[in-house]
């Protein structure tokens, strides 16, 4: 199991954490919170029963810009488990030009191995730092030969208590950062990886070729002259890589991928067969993608470069706006594999007010922080926030409803002049009120033709 505290979070705690970043959509948050908690519950069961409990996959339905993708993004951070987000439109039926759906699981395995490798390196960090420190000191103060039979590798790892007085002094200076700008010459491992461009659908071949060239050049090193400040992170990374066991990492990562993996499939509605007459041209390929996804969701074995991954217990969360298609337009077998349906509601003016002010990294806080870097103290009055929310809701209603993304457009337009002039206004304070908002945006909002192209 992943070595994380978030694995034991209750559904209520998960929802509270999501509330810090996402406004509203309580039903969707509850659904993903319960699904996450069920992963933990399943792992507490006896092994015989554990294998019979399948994840309840989720289908999120709602217009664009209401928080579907943001929920997935925050969930990935929160779960600290193998997670991959893909767009259904990037995949095509087997035999067509495009990505094979099995690439989803290969990407998940890559993510899992990377996650576990980073965790393993964190565990050996202190030891790696000590080894890196010794290598830097060896470059600064080469050890004296101990005569016949002297083993330089054994000498390198002598206890620090046996260091001579000069070495102890240099070690203290090194830890205090007093030697950071001094240049040293070191043997540094060479990364023999090679970038290989492959056509769509042949990513696996590209990975295998990269691995082959990497193995051919493995173990090589070269002498480089670096400052101690630049050399230290390179040496720590290299020493940590020597200390971790790659076989153990791969075994644990594959198990985590199978037991805790989460796949988020966005824009699932774009591969649904649409009901209109005359739209059958692309339906064959769309239905083919669904049929290729079906074995992954039902449970199958996928070969990856780390080993075979069983997808039986991977949690799949799909989302789509379903403007032109309906969930019932998906093939029946795939519909049945997403038993939990959650509808996300369109955002209102009141939601926009909350989005602008409540989240931990709310848009207004972001702009205030950005302009503060130029020495401009920007503040938004409550009337300005209310007016901005009203304008965003109006434009969404009059034109295409793009949800909270409209706020980005409105705020960029509002602060266009101030952002341009900020370097010349160092030390000034600017308060944005409703009058300022109307002065900057009023004409655009009132003119439908202008707002269509600018807002």
Swiss-Prot record:
Residue positions binding ATP: 23, 65-70, 266, 333, 405
Gene this chain is encoded by: hslU
Source organism per UniProt: Xanthomonas campestris pv. campestris (strain ATCC 33913 / DSM 3586 / NCPPB 528 / LMG 568 / P 25)
Family to which this protein belongs: Belongs to the ClpX chaperone family. HslU subfamily.
Subunit-structure text: A double ring-shaped homohexamer of HslV is capped on each side by a ring-shaped HslU homohexamer. The assembly of the HslU/HslV complex is dependent on binding of ATP.
InterPro entries: AAA+_ATPase, ATP-dep_Clp_protease_ClpX, ATPase_AAA_core, Clp_ATPase_C, HslU, P-loop_NTPase
Role summary: ATPase subunit of a proteasome-like degradation complex; this subunit has chaperone activity. The binding of ATP and its subsequent hydrolysis by HslU are essential for unfolding of protein substrates subsequently hydrolyzed by HslV. HslU recognizes the N-terminal part of its protein substrates and unfolds these before they are guided to HslV for hydrolysis.
Compartments it resides in: Cytoplasm
Entries under SUPFAM superfamilies matching the protein: P-loop containing nucleoside triphosphate hydrolases
Single GO molecular function: ATP binding
Assigned keywords, A-Z: ATP-binding, Chaperone, Cytoplasm, Nucleotide-binding
Protein name, as recorded: ATP-dependent protease ATPase subunit HslU
Pfam families in the cross-refs: AAA, AAA_2
Gene Ontology CC annotation, any one: HslUV protease complex
GO BP, one annotated term: proteolysis involved in protein catabolic process
């Amino acid at each position: 199991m992943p070595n994380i505290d978030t694995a034991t979070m209750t559904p209520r705690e998960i929802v509270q954490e999501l509330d810090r970043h996402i406004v509203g959509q309580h039903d969707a948050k509850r659904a993903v919170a319960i699904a996450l908690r069920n992963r933990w519950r399943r792992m507490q069961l006896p092994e015989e029963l554990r294998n019979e409990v399948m994840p309840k996959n989720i289908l999120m339905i709602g217009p664009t810009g209401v928080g579907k993708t943001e929920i997935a993004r925050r969930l990935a951070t929160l779960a600290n488990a193998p997670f991959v987000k893909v767009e259904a439109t990037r995949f095509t039926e087997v035999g067509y030009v495009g990505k094979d759906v099995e690439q989803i699981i290969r990407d998940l395995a890559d993510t899992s191995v990377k996650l576990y490798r980073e965790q393993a390196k964190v565990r050996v960090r202190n030891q790696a730092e000590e080894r890196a420190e010794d290598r830097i000191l060896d470059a600064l103060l080469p050890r004296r030969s101990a005569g016949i039979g002297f083993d330089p590798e054994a000498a390198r790892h002598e206890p620090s208590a046996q260091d001579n007085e000069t070495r102890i002094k240099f070690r203290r200076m090194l830890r205090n950062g007093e030697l950071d700008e001094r240049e040293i010459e070191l043997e540094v491992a060479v990364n023999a990886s090679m970038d290989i461009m492959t056509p769509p659908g042949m990513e696996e071949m590209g990975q295998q070729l990269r691995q082959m060239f990497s193995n051919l050049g493995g173990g090589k090193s070269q002498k480089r002259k670096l400052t101690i400040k630049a050399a230290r992170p390179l040496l720590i990374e290299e020493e940590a890589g020597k200390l971790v066991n790659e076989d153990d990492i791969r075994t644990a990562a594959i198990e985590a991928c199978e037991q805790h993996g989460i796949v988020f499939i966005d824009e699932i509605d774009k591969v649904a067969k649409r009901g209109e007459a005359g739209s059958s041209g692309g339906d064959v390929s769309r239905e083919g993608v669904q049929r290729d996804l079906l074995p992954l969701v039902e449970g199958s074995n996928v070969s990856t470069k780390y080993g075979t991954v069983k997808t039986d217990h991977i949690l799949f969360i799909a989302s789509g706006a379903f403007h032109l298609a309906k969930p019932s337009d998906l093939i029946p077998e795939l519909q049945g594999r997403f038993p939990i349906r959650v509808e996300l509601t369109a955002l209102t003016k009141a939601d926009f007010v909350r989005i602008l002010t409540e989240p931990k990294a709310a848009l207004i806080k972001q702009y205030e922080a950005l302009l503060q870097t130029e020495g401009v103290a920007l503040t938004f009055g409550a009337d300005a926030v209310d007016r901005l929310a009203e304008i965003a809701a109006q434009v969404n209603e009059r034109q295409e409803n793009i949800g909270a993304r409209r706020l980005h457009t409105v705020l960029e337009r509002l602060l266009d002049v101030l952002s341009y002039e900020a370097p010349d206004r160092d030390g000034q304070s600017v308060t944005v009120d409703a009058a300022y908002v109307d002065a900057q945006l009023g004409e655009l909002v009132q003119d439908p033709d202008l707002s269509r192209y600018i807002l």
